[in-house]
């Protein structure tokens, strides 16, 4: 049985429990607290307080999310879209992607290597299949084209 979130102390405790498990964005944390029965009038001041204390940080959340999703084999376009769906500001997302130290070409090459065992497409059908896969994963079309045509060979 879950506790009723009708006091600032209960909301703060629940928010800190959630933040102890992993970083959360403000919008995501608000949604989770609402689902547990907290009201917006009580949520906002507590989240403001957590942010002032440095316990709730959008920048840390962005960095953590980008590191996790890129490590799972997703590219910048897919990550950008997922963060946008989570209610984060487009400018903050773009800045976090620029500041991330992810080598997207290397990441795309690793994903392609795992999926297709390094076999470049021999016909239009297999090229389309590999292109769709990498595009779905969120890698830019120009990078995909260079990889599949072999123009990036000297980099790997």
Swiss-Prot record:
The keyword Cytoplasm applies. One of its GO terms (biological process) is regulation of DNA repair. Its main location: cytoplasm. It comes from the Bacteria. Gene3D superfamilies: Winged helix-like DNA-binding domain superfamily/Winged helix DNA-binding domain (1.10.10.10). The keyword Transcription regulation does not apply. Keywords: Cytoplasm. GO terms for cellular component: cytoplasm. Pfam families: RecX_HTH1, RecX_HTH2, RecX_HTH3. It is found in: Cytoplasm. Modulates RecA activity. HAMAP family: RecX. NCBIfam families: PRK00117.2-1 (NF001054). Belongs to the RecX family. This is Regulatory protein RecX.
